[in-house]
């Protein structure tokens, strides 16, 4: 079954998927990290793919607001997707935008020397019962 709708063998990575089936309407919902928008295959977005025909076809929706680079972030550590009543709820991790500052107390020079990319936990809600849901 093909979930993503970018060209076959495009070279773009899609990874760390999570699936949920809505028990009220039978829709199949898959959340995944997606690099199709970046020819260099580094910047990532979170995509929600939804099927209302038992998984025969999927419509893809850009779920995260802006693409991010996930280097040194904890992608996949905080991921979840659930669906009920025509609504899909998702949680995912993103690397913080450039310039985002985090302060922590480390121990010695080794702690200060480690590259650190702050990880942000995002929550998404897609309401397919509401009018106007649009795909990518």
Which positions does each model-derived feature cover?
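Extracellular, repeat-based ectodomains that mediate carbohydrate processing or recognition
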Residues: 1-136
């Amino acid at each position: 079954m093909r979930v993503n709708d970018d060209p076959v063998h495009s070279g773009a990575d899609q990874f760390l998927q999570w699936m949920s089936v809505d028990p009220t309407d039978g829709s199949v919902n898959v959340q995944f990290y997606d690099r199709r928008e970046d020819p260099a295959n580094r910047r990532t977005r979170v995509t929600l793919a939804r099927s209302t025909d038992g998984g025969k076809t999927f419509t893809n929706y850009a779920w995260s607001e802006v693409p991010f680079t996930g280097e040194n972030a904890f992608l996949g550590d905080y991921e979840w997707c659930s669906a009920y009543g025509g609504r899909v709820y998702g949680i995912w991790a993103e690397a913080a935008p450039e310039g985002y500052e985090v302060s922590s107390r480390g121990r010695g020079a080794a702690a200060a020397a480690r590259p650190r990319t702050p990880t942000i936990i995002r929550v998404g809600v897609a309401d397919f019962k509401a009018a106007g849901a649009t795909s990518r």
